[in-house]
Swiss-Prot record:
TM annotation in the entry: 13-33, 34-54, 78-95, 99-116, 139-159, 165-185, 214-234, 243-263, 289-309, 340-360, 365-385
One GO cellular component term noted in the UniProt record for this chain: plasma membrane
Coiled-coil portions: none
CDD domains: MFS_MdtH_MDR_like
HAMAP family from the UniProt entry: MFS_MdtH (MF_01529)
Protein name as it appears in the record: Multidrug resistance protein MdtH
Classification via PANTHER family: MULTIDRUG RESISTANCE PROTEIN MDTH, RESISTANCE PROTEIN MDTM, PUTATIVE-RELATED-RELATED
Subcellular location per the Swiss-Prot or TrEMBL entry: Cell inner membrane
PROSITE patterns: MFS (PS50850)
GO function terms (MF aspect): transmembrane transporter activity
Membrane topology category: Multi-pass membrane protein
Similarity comment text for this entry: Belongs to the major facilitator superfamily. DHA1 family. MdtH (TC 2.A.1.2.21) subfamily.
Organism lineage string: Bacteria, Pseudomonadati, Pseudomonadota, Gammaproteobacteria, Enterobacterales
Organism per entry: Photorhabdus laumondii subsp. laumondii (strain DSM 15139 / CIP 105565 / TT01) (Photorhabdus luminescens subsp. laumondii)
Keywords: Cell inner membrane, Cell membrane, Membrane, Transmembrane, Transmembrane helix, Transport
C-alpha cells in the first residue's frame, strides 16, 4: 500500500470515529428537546419548533462562511472551535427556563456546527476517491443511524432523572470530540488551493447549477427534519410515554444497518443519482399523508418504516450528488453552501411544523400538518424532476464517477 493510500485509509477511520462522537453527542440531546419542553413543561410547539428551526437555519445558513474560512485556514482550528461552541450551547439548554434562553442556546449550538460541519464534509471528499465516495457516505449514514439510537437510548434513560443530565452528557461528548480532533487530526488543507474567503463564496454563488439544486432541496429537508420535532411528539402522544421514542430510532437504525449500504450498491449501478434521490423523496412524501389519521402505535411505526426507507434511499445519493457538483478549488465553500437548503428547510420545517401542529390541534384537524408536508414533498419532487430534465448535467458526474 502506497503512503498516499495508507494516509487515505487512516483518515477514513479517523472520520468514522469522529462522526460517531458527533452523532452520539447530538442525539443524546436534540430528540428529547421537544418532549421535555412541549410534553413535560407544556410550552407551545411553535416556541420549541422556532428554537429548533433557528438552530437549523443559523448553522446551515451560515455554513458557506464556515466553509470559506476553512478553505482559507484549514479544517482543524475550525473543527475544534466549533465543537467547543456546540458543548457550550448544550450547557445553556440545560439551564433554559425561558424561551429566550433556549433560543440563545440553540444559536450557540448552531454557530458551533457552522464551524465544524463544512470542513468535516470537505475532508470526506478529500480522503475518498470518486468511485468509493457514495459507499463511504452510506457507511457514515449507517453510523448516523446506529449513533442516533444509542444517543436516544442514553438520553431517554437520563431523562427519567433530570433533563439537565441529558444536556451535560451531550456537552461532555462534544468536549471529548474537540480533544480528539485537537490531538490527532492532521493540519489538512481541504481545497486544492488556499482560496481567499470571499473568492470561494463568490465561486459558489455564481454556479447557477449548484445554486438551483441546493435551493430545490428546501422542500426535502422540510420533511426530513420532522424526525426531530413532530415524529417524536406523535409517537409520545399515541404510545403515552416518551420512552417509545427510542423505538422510532431503533427502526431507523435497523433499516439503515441492513438496507442502506446494499441499496446504495445495487442502485448506483442501475440508476442515476438524481433518480435515487427522487425515489427516496417520493416514499418520504407518501408516508406523510396517513399519519394524522391513525391512533395505533404499530401502524404509526409502519409509516415511519416507509419514511426511513425513503431516507436511506435518498440520502447517499443526495450527499454524493452534492460532492460531485462541488468545485475542488473551493470544497469548503461548496459544502458550506450545500447546507443552505437544510437551513431553509429546517427553519420552515421546524417553525412551520410547530405552528401547523398547534393549529391542527386547535381546529381539531390533527392530520393538517402531515397532509401539507406530503404535498410539499410532492411539489419538491416535481421541481427536481424539471431541474434534472431541463439542465443536462454531465453523465459522469451524475453517476458519481
Amino acid at each position: 500500500m502506497s503512503l498516499v493510500s495508507q494516509a487515505r485509509s487512516l483518515g477514513k477511520y479517523f472520520l468514522l470515529f469522529d462522526n460517531l462522537l458527533v452523532v452520539l453527542g447530538f442525539f443524546v440531546v436534540f430528540p428529547l428537546i421537544s418532549i421535555h419542553f412541549v410534553e413535560q413543561l407544556g410550552w407551545a410547539a411553535l416556541v420549541v419548533g422556532f428554537a429548533l428551526g433557528l438552530r437549523q437555519f443559523v448553522q446551515q445558513g451560515l455554513g458557506i462562511f464556515g466553509g470559506a474560512i476553512a478553505d482559507r485556514f484549514g479544517a482543524k482550528p475550525m473543527i475544534v472551535t466549533g465543537m467547543l461552541l456546540r458543548a457550550l450551547g448544550f450547557a445553556f439548554i440545560a439551564l433554559a427556563t425561558e424561551p429566550w434562553i433556549l433560543w440563545l442556546a440553540c444559536i450557540l449550538s448552531a454557530l458551533g456546527g457552522t464551524l465544524f460541519d463544512p470542513p468535516r464534509t470537505a475532508l470526506v471528499i478529500k480522503l475518498t476517491r470518486p468511485h468509493e465516495r457514495g459507499r463511504f457516505f452510506s457507511l457514515l449514514l449507517m453510523q448516523d443511524s446506529a449513533g442516533a439510537v444509542i444517543g436516544a437510548l442514553i438520553g431517554s434513560w437520563l431523562l427519567q432523572y433530570d433533563f439537565q443530565f441529558v444536556c451535560w452528557t451531550g456537552a461532555g461528548v462534544f468536549v471529548l470530540a474537540a480533544i480528539w480532533n485537537a490531538l490527532f487530526l492532521p493540519a489538512y488543507r481541504i481545497s486544492t488551493t488556499r482560496t481567499p474567503i470571499w473568492e470561494g463564496m463568490e465561486r459558489v454563488i455564481k454556479d447557477r447549477r449548484f445554486f438551483t439544486y441546493v435551493l430545490t432541496l428546501t422542500g426535502y429537508f422540510m420533511l426530513s427534519v420532522q424526525v426531530m420535532l413532530m415524529f417524536p411528539i406523535i409517537v409520545n402522544e399515541i404510545a403515552g410515554t416518551p420512552a417509545a421514542v427510542k423505538w422510532m430510532y431503533a427502526i431507523e437504525a435497523t433499516l439503515s444497518l441492513t438496507l442502506l449500504y446494499p441499496i446504495a450498491r445495487w442502485s448506483e449501478k442501475r440508476f442515476r443519482l438524481e433518480q435515487r434521490l427522487m425515489a427516496g423523496l417520493f416514499l418520504m412524501s407518501l408516508s406523510m399523508f396517513p399519519v394524522g389519521l391513525i391512533g395505533e402505535i404499530n401502524t404509526l411505526f409502519g409509516l415511519i418504516c416507509l419514511f426511513y426507507l425513503g431516507t436511506v434511499t435518498a440520502e447517499p445519493a443526495r450527499e454524493t450528488l452534492s460532492a460531485s457538483l462541488a468545485d475542488p478549488r473551493a470544497r469548503g465553500s461548496y459544502m458550506g453552501f450545500s447546507r443552505l437548503g437544510l437551513a431553509l428547510g429546517g427553519a420552515l420545517g421546524y417553525t412551520g411544523g410547530g405552528w401547523l401542529y398547534d393549529t391542527g390541534h386547535a381546529l381539531n384537524i390533527p392530520q393538517l400538518p402531515w397532509f401539507l408536508l406530503g404535498i410539499i414533498g410532492l411539489i419538491t419532487l416535481y421541481a427536481l424532476h424539471r431541474q434534472f430534465n431541463q439542465r443536462k448535467i454531465e453523465s459522469a458526474m451524475l453517476s458519481g464517477n
